[in-house]
Amino acid sequence: MVVIRLARGGSKKRPFFNIVATDSRNRRDGRFIERVGFYNPLASEGEEGLRVVADRLAYWQGVGAQLSPTVARLVKQNAAKAAA
């Protein structure tokens, strides 16, 4: 099953996450099919903290990919922020 989840990057104490479409059997930071965005929890005011390629996210959901709970929360917050 294909899932869309966070893959951790960055250095120690400086997390950075790629939002990736991957097979659920792969490791968290292992092989992935496609990178559909990123999340930087330590982004300052001038930096972009979250970027999601909406059409690719919609494509993967259309072919049956499941969002992880954290990615679903981030996408929902981003949509609310964009609408406001």
UniProtKB/Swiss-Prot annotation:
GO function terms (MF aspect): structural constituent of ribosome
Keywords of this entry: Ribonucleoprotein, Ribosomal protein
Pfam families in UniProt: Ribosomal_S16
GO biological process: one example: translation
GO cellular component: cytoplasm; small ribosomal subunit
UniProt keyword Mitochondrion, yes or no: no
The keyword Ribosomal protein is assigned to this record: yes
Family recorded in the similarity comment: Belongs to the bacterial ribosomal protein bS16 family.
Record protein name field: Small ribosomal subunit protein bS16
Taxonomic source organism: Cupriavidus pinatubonensis (strain JMP 134 / LMG 1197)
